[in-house]
């Protein structure tokens, strides 16, 4: 459910008087509306600071669903360590080869592109084995239209025990919820692989 919070004011006092770059990391698991930005000195948008741009697209694992803060999501940590500017297109439950996402990546400046795909296709039970490879190639072809020479890394899904050999959809484990734990279970059956349902093992081997 959506529960709007009260308006709040954040104040940053005691900053040095010289020109400085200020980055505000907004919550990664909430929608934030900026009502006003006030300052006692001139504000200017940051231009090109010379850093390379890393564009990453993935699932909630990339969005940081379980991270403690937006700057401690794994892509943010990796970008900080590499000294690059991160554009994180991690969409919880929605890394699904949507054409508009491919077009957005195609039309966005990037020096490196990485795609971490697979888990949402299985836990959403979105498509069958026959559609998987063409969907991947269509997604990549669209991106390549705008980035013919940009390094592009496709990362297979990390281990997820419930979906390694068992198709989705995934669902909450109600017994675990009753005990205060958030766990998931696969509602598909291993035998459904023969009917074309996806598993993580199939995606890695395709």
Regions found by a protein language model. Name each.
Residues 1, 12, 22-24, 78, ...:
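Generic structural hydrophobic/aromatic packing signal, biased to beta-strands
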Residues 1-53, 145, 165, 172-184:
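N-terminal secretory targeting modules
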Residues 2, 28-33, 88-91, 128-132, ...:
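Short linear motifs at secondary-structure transitions and domain/linker junctions
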Residues 5-7, 36-39, 96, 135-136, ...:
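Short amphipathic alpha-helical surface micro-motifs
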Residues 15, 22-92, 99-109:
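Serine-esterase "nucleophile elbow" of acetyl-processing enzymes
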Residues 93-94, 120:
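Positions that flank functional sites
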Residues 99-206:
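Alpha-helical cap/lid subdomain in secreted, periplasmic
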């Amino acid at each position: 459910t959506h529960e709007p919070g009260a308006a709040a004011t954040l104040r940053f006092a005691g900053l040095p008087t010289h020109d400085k770059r200020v980055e505000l990391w907004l919550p990664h698991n909430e929608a934030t509306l900026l009502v006003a930005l006030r300052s006692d000195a001139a504000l200017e948008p940051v231009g090109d600071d010379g850093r390379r741009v890393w564009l990453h697209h993935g699932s909630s694992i990339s969005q940081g669903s379980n991270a403690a803060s937006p700057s401690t999501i794994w892509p943010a940590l990796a970008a900080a360590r590499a000294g690059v500017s991160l554009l994180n297109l991690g969409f919880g439950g929605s890394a699904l080869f949507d054409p508009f996402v491919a077009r957005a990546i195609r039309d966005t400046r990037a020096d490196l592109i990485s795609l971490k795909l697979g888990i949402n296709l299985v836990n959403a039970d979105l498509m069958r084995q026959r559609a998987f490879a063409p969907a991947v190639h269509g997604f990549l072809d669209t991106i390549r239209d705008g980035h013919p020479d940009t390094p592009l890394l496709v990362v297979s899904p990390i281990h997820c025990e419930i979906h390694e050999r068992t198709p989705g959809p995934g669902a909450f484990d109600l017994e675990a919820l009753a005990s205060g734990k958030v766990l998931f279970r696969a509602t598909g059956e291993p035998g459904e692989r023969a009917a074309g349902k996806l598993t993580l093992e199939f995606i890695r081997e395709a």
